[in-house]
């Protein structure tokens, strides 16, 4: 009788110790910290053979007298012309007289993309048609493959919008986003049209 109870007890201990390694139970454990219950340590007992940045100290040769190579110190002029005028046009639409739009000052962006409202406001079709209207002749002459891929993409998107997204385009037209006389200098979200000036 004692041997049976002892073997049963050892089997229970063995199964519980094995279950301790795997946490697959659907019953939530009672822990003192919620993050601790979700933290799974999958690298226990693993020795990292590479340098962990921020964890391990920097590799140094012991008793080495050569100083660590560092870039030469540069004296930076905090009041240089470039630093002093940084961000001067950020609020020109609020503080200016309204004659200059902030999109016209985005010199780091391509000309055809300045002030474009983005993929969440304007769709890809409008952007590609605008690009094609500006660079159609140059693309056809210099890179015919890119020109062909652009035409294919526009054709596919036109089919998609004509058959699948008619309600969306109709809603945009009803919002008044499509003006008869669009502004060609920049693509503002309030002035969008398929008709664009060809340079």
From Swiss-Prot:
Q: Name one GO molecular function term.
A: structural constituent of ribosome
Q: Main localisation, per the record?
A: mitochondrion
Q: Which UniProt keywords apply?
A: Mitochondrion, Ribonucleoprotein, Ribosomal protein, Transit peptide
Q: What Pfam families does the record point to?
A: MRP-L51
Q: Where is the transit peptide?
A: 1-15
List, alphabetically, the GO terms of the cellular component aspect. Answer: mitochondrial large ribosomal subunit; mitochondrial ribosome
Q: Per the UniProt entry, what are the Gene Ontology biological process annotations, in alphabetical order?
A: mitochondrial translation; translation
Its subcellular locations are:
Mitochondrion
InterPro entries linked: Ribosomal_mL51
Q: How does it assemble?
A: Component of the mitochondrial ribosome large subunit (39S) which comprises a 16S rRNA and about 50 distinct proteins.
- What PANTHER family is this protein classified in? LARGE RIBOSOMAL SUBUNIT PROTEIN ML51, MITOCHONDRIAL 39S RIBOSOMAL PROTEIN L51
Provide the family line. Answer: Belongs to the mitochondrion-specific ribosomal protein mL51 family.
Q: What is this protein called?
A: Large ribosomal subunit protein mL51
**Source organism of the structure:** Caenorhabditis elegans
